[in-house]
Amino acid sequence: GYDFRQSNRIDKAMAGLRAKLETAYKASGGKKVNIISHSMGGLLVRCFMSMNHDIFSKYVNKWICIACPFQGAPGCINDSLLTGLQFVYGFESFFFVSRWAMHQLLVECPSIYEMLPNPNFEWKEKPIIQVWRKNPEKDGTVELVLYEATDCVSLFEEALQNNELNYNGKTIALPFNMSIYKWATETRRILENAQLPDTVSFYSIHGTSYETPYDVW
């Protein structure tokens, strides 16, 4: 089955999607398939298209994307790496995965690193991270420090340098994983090299004019 934690271009995912396309193609009597992808699923499909261009062209008729983060998901991903994610609040949160537990999981997920903001994209307004930090040179005065989200690896490394998990009496270090980051950088290259076949129709569905704390997208 599909594992959202893994990279969007691992062999198992690519082979699995190919098998499903072939099965659907044969079951329909040789008719091409229409793919509908949502959110990160769009990255998986785009990786497949980039790495298996001829196969994609053979089996796919239309590709419809709904809210796919092709240039990354700065707000969600940066927050995930720094503080984790919390899906449920209030009393219900006692019955769901905690923000801390989710954070420790996401730090080791290749898919999360693959949704860091694209540094090569010409953003209308570059995403930023705001962090309140003590300044030791000013008697510990707390200051608001801004980081461009497309160039904040040093922030992640510093924030997670002492991050660790205790499991079965053992302490496991969970810093910002540079090996995974390098893998994700290669994934970004694969995504950017993707070319839509002339025979495939492409539709991208996304919201516009949504007010955020800094801009309207």
Region locations from a protein language model:
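N-terminal non-catalytic accessory region
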Residues: 1-158, 207, 211-212
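C-terminal subdomain of alpha/beta-hydrolase-fold enzymes, centered on the catalytic histidine
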Residues: 146-217
